[in-house]
């Protein structure tokens, strides 16, 4: 499967076979790194990393993956990039495309990364937008494949919580594209948009995926192998929305009881991180003092239990991002 010079903007752009090719390559690269026999296939390549939103995992994954493969990466932090402020997206794309072999973008509007791809003349990779998080999806799929013990098209997973944004959208599309049994458990007001749901159903017709959207969290998790969640308040939202979001989502918190409701003693917990699972951060302590919650979207008991595979998931960000870059740029 030839993925040379391909943009990586959203999973909707790819066939199930192409997504599986990325996963297979990521698994190969992971094995090679751990065995100390990694072959550098991106020597002499230069990659620009544009971050309009800050990040730990995405930045580190791109930088380490590039370095492992012999490439150099330039990090453009939020305060350093002029994109859309003093210089148009179109002009930024054309400038960076002359200097770099690929561009990663992490920011707000999906339209921005699509416009970069239109004008850059080099592969563009989506590190996260408000609408989609495709590199996270490869990491999640690889992690589920490693822990499932059966093919992904025989695997069921649920996402519970606020499903309107990049994680809910992307997991729904991922499951549909890979023929999985995917469930969304959320208040209807926090479901993905009608357009995303329609796209998922269209993909499911091709792959045999099963799609369920329900307001009942226990129904969503029944029989699944994996339960995913994400933070209830996104980057940049005001503190005032916390009370409203907690009131809406308190029944979707991942607790030992919700894990048990899966009926699967081997069920695993997944989270793209960072997670509010205790009081050990300033935000976590503020939430406890303000709302009396020790842990928000997931309890400490679940997060730190053997069911939690979030750090396998985080590690796989690097291996799957490396696969995206090697597929596009590798010799």
Curated annotation (Swiss-Prot):
<keyword id="KW-0028">Amino-acid biosynthesis</keyword>
<dbReference type="GO" id="GO:0019240">
    <property type="term" value="P:citrulline biosynthetic process"/>
</dbReference>
<feature type="binding site">
    <location>
        <begin position="272"/>
        <end position="273"/>
    </location>
    <ligand>
        <name>carbamoyl phosphate</name>
    </ligand>
</feature>
<feature type="binding site">
    <location>
        <position position="317"/>
    </location>
    <ligand>
        <name>carbamoyl phosphate</name>
    </ligand>
</feature>
<dbReference type="Pfam" id="PF02729">
    <property type="entry name" value="OTCace_N"/>
</dbReference>
<feature type="binding site">
    <location>
        <begin position="55"/>
        <end position="58"/>
    </location>
    <ligand>
        <name>carbamoyl phosphate</name>
    </ligand>
</feature>
<dbReference type="InterPro" id="IPR036901">
    <property type="entry name" value="Asp/Orn_carbamoylTrfase_sf"/>
</dbReference>
<dbReference type="Pfam" id="PF00185">
    <property type="entry name" value="OTCace"/>
</dbReference>
<feature type="binding site">
    <location>
        <begin position="133"/>
        <end position="136"/>
    </location>
    <ligand>
        <name>carbamoyl phosphate</name>
    </ligand>
</feature>
<comment type="function">
    <text>Reversibly catalyzes the transfer of the carbamoyl group from carbamoyl phosphate (CP) to the N(epsilon) atom of ornithine (ORN) to produce L-citrulline.</text>
</comment>
<comment type="pathway">
    <text>Amino-acid biosynthesis; L-arginine biosynthesis; L-arginine from L-ornithine and carbamoyl phosphate: step 1/3.</text>
</comment>
<dbReference type="GO" id="GO:0042450">
    <property type="term" value="P:arginine biosynthetic process via ornithine"/>
</dbReference>
<feature type="binding site">
    <location>
        <position position="106"/>
    </location>
    <ligand>
        <name>carbamoyl phosphate</name>
    </ligand>
</feature>
<dbReference type="InterPro" id="IPR006130">
    <property type="entry name" value="Asp/Orn_carbamoylTrfase"/>
</dbReference>
<dbReference type="GO" id="GO:0005737">
    <property type="term" value="C:cytoplasm"/>
</dbReference>
<dbReference type="InterPro" id="IPR002292">
    <property type="entry name" value="Orn/put_carbamltrans"/>
</dbReference>
<dbReference type="InterPro" id="IPR024904">
    <property type="entry name" value="OTCase_ArgI"/>
</dbReference>
<keyword id="KW-0808">Transferase</keyword>
<dbReference type="InterPro" id="IPR006132">
    <property type="entry name" value="Asp/Orn_carbamoyltranf_P-bd"/>
</dbReference>
<protein>
    <recommendedName>
        <fullName>Ornithine carbamoyltransferase</fullName>
        <ecNumber>2.1.3.3</ecNumber>
    </recommendedName>
</protein>
<feature type="binding site">
    <location>
        <position position="82"/>
    </location>
    <ligand>
        <name>carbamoyl phosphate</name>
    </ligand>
</feature>
<keyword id="KW-0055">Arginine biosynthesis</keyword>
<feature type="binding site">
    <location>
        <position position="230"/>
    </location>
    <ligand>
        <name>L-ornithine</name>
    </ligand>
</feature>
<dbReference type="GO" id="GO:0006526">
    <property type="term" value="P:L-arginine biosynthetic process"/>
</dbReference>
<feature type="binding site">
    <location>
        <position position="166"/>
    </location>
    <ligand>
        <name>L-ornithine</name>
    </ligand>
</feature>
<comment type="similarity">
    <text>Belongs to the aspartate/ornithine carbamoyltransferase superfamily. OTCase family.</text>
</comment>
<keyword id="KW-0963">Cytoplasm</keyword>
<feature type="binding site">
    <location>
        <begin position="234"/>
        <end position="235"/>
    </location>
    <ligand>
        <name>L-ornithine</name>
    </ligand>
</feature>
<dbReference type="InterPro" id="IPR006131">
    <property type="entry name" value="Asp_carbamoyltransf_Asp/Orn-bd"/>
</dbReference>
<dbReference type="GO" id="GO:0016597">
    <property type="term" value="F:amino acid binding"/>
</dbReference>
<dbReference type="GO" id="GO:0004585">
    <property type="term" value="F:ornithine carbamoyltransferase activity"/>
</dbReference>
């Amino acid at each position: 499967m030839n993925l040379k010079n391909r943009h990586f903007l959203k999973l909707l752009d790819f066939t199930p076979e192409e997504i599986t090719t990325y996963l297979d390559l990521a698994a190969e690269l992971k094995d090679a790194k751990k065995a100390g026999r990694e072959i550098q296939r991106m020597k002499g390549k230069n990659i620009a990393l544009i971050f309009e939103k800050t990040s730990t995992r995405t930045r580190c994954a791109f930088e380490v993956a590039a370095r492992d493969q012999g490439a150099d990466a330039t990090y453009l932090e939020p305060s350093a990039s002029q994109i859309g402020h003093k210089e148009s997206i179109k002009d930024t794309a054309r400038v960076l495309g002359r200097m770099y072999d690929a561009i990663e973008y992490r920011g707000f509007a999906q339209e921005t990364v699509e416009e970069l791809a239109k004008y850059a003349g080099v592969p563009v990779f989506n590190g996260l937008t408000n609408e989609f998080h495709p590199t996270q999806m490869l990491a999640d799929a690889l992690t589920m494949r490693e822990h499932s013990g059966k093919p992904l098209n025989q695997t069921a997973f649920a996402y519970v919580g606020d499903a309107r944004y990049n994680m809910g959208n992307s997991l729904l599309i991922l499951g549909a594209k890979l023929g999985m049994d995917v469930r969304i458990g959320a208040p209807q007001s926090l479901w993905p948009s009608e357009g995303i749901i329609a796209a998922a159903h269209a993909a499911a017709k091709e792959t045999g995926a099963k799609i369920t959207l329900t307001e009942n969290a226990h129904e969503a998790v029944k029989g699944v192998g994996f339960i995913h969640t994400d933070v209830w308040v996104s980057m940049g939202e005001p503190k005032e929305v916390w009370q409203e979001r907690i009131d809406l989502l308190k029944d979707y918190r991942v607790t030992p009881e919700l894990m048990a409701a899966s009926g699967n003693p081997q069920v695993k917990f997944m989270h793209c991180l960072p997670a509010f699972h205790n009081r050990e951060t300033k935000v976590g302590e503020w939430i406890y003092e303000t709302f009396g919650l020790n842990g928000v979207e997931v309890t400490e008991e679940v997060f730190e239990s053997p069911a939690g595979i979030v750090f396998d998931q985080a590690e796989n960000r690097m291996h799957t991002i490396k696969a995206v870059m090697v597929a596009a740029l590798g010799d």
